[in-house]
UniProtKB/Swiss-Prot annotation:
Belongs to the protein N5-glutamine methyltransferase family. PrmC subfamily. This is Release factor glutamine methyltransferase. It catalyses: L-glutaminyl-[peptide chain release factor] + S-adenosyl-L-methionine = N(5)-methyl-L-glutaminyl-[peptide chain release factor] + S-adenosyl-L-homocysteine + H(+). S-adenosyl-L-methionine binds at residues 131-135, 162, 189, 205. Substrate binds at residues 205-208. It comes from Pasteurella multocida (strain Pm70). The gene is prmC. The lineage of its organism: Bacteria, Pseudomonadati, Pseudomonadota, Gammaproteobacteria, Pasteurellales. It is an enzyme of class 2 (transferase).
Length: 298
């Protein structure tokens, strides 16, 4: 079987997944699987489409295709996912980084850069990423802020925490792979942190889905860890906990940025306001949905 013949076969098999994943790109995924097994570039696979696959390659492709046909996310099958400017390892112990979270990174960068150029930073910029998972948010911030802080003679201290030991280990691997200086710690939210430590900025993409949400039975989330998706109180328990506890770990005029569901913004703003946060605002994602809410502490 040639590259071209296998691609056509894989596209036919994967088309059955369209019902559960309407955004599935069967053409791209068939090429990705070929790239993974043959170790050849996309351009090479397309240019030499009549190349015949070996028996070993066909067996490996059959295994990968079977996993994808069952709905397993392509990121888990490949073991990696692009986020921001980074290539990150992923596993079944972590959420798969999504483009919507880059909105959180963008606005966190805006705040951090303003902080660096203001009188609020004295020698160090400290950032905490709660529920870090793959380390995506923390590492993206490190990639962008390291040159700026070095130029300004400021020490950059970024800490990512996660309750899952395997996620912490994976995040450390991603930091090493991308040659970025970020510390990672196993902790249930703030529990394992030094109570004396203070941060300029706290960011988080916490669990925010209600356990009865029908979307949990659709698409990639069927394979992702429920502990990283689902929260009590109809999805608000972890958000509420973070908003209530964050002031204990923030420097004066520090900020908290939280990602949440697109229909949760009003309730999240209310929780911020009831806890006496200032300048509470919600920011939209690339689809125009309210996705990130921030607040500043006095």
């Amino acid at each position: 079987m040639t590259y071209q013949e296998w691609r056509q076969f894989a596209e036919h098999v994967l088309m059955k997944n369209k019902e559960n994943d309407p955004f599935l790109d069967v053409k791209s995924e068939s090429v990705l699987l070929l790239q993974t097994v043959t170790k050849r570039s996309k351009a090479s696979i397309l240019a030499f489409s009549e190349t015949v696959l070996t028996e070993v390659e066909l067996q490996q492709l059959a295994q990968l295709l079977m996993r994808r046909a069952k709905g397993e996310p392509i990121a888990y099958i490949l073991g990696e996912k692009a986020f921001w400017s980074l290539s990150l390892k992923v596993s079944e112990h972590t959420l798969i980084p999504r483009p919507d979270t880059e909105v959180l990174v963008e606005h966190a960068l805006d705040f951090a850069k303003q902080r660096v150029t203001s009188a609020h930073v004295s020698g160090e910029l400290s950032i905490l990423d709660l529920g870090t998972g793959t380390g995506a948010i923390a590492l993206a911030l490190a990639a962008e802020l390291t040159p700026l802080t070095q130029k300004c003679g400021i020490n950059l201290n970024i800490l990512g925490v996660d309750r899952i030991a395997e996620a912490v280990a994976l995040a450390k691997d991603n930091a090493k792979q991308n040659e970025l200086k970020v510390n990672f710690l196993q902790s249930v939210w703030f529990d394992a942190l030094n109570p004396e430590i203070r941060f300029d900025l706290i960011v988080s993409n916490p669990p925010y889905i209600d356990k009865n949400d029908p979307h949990l039975t659709q698409g990639d989330v069927r394979f992702e860890p429920l502990s990283a998706l689902v929260a009590a109180e109809e999805g608000y328990a972890d958000i509420r906990h973070i908003i209530e506890q964050a002031p204990l770990f923030l420097k004066p005029q520090g900020a908290l940025l939280l990602e949440h569901g697109w229909q949760q913004a009003e309730k999240v703003r209310s929780i911020f306001q009831k806890n006496l946060w200032h300048n509470v605002a919600t920011l939209k994602d690339y689809s125009g949905n309210e996705r990130v809410t921030l607040g500043c502490w006095r």
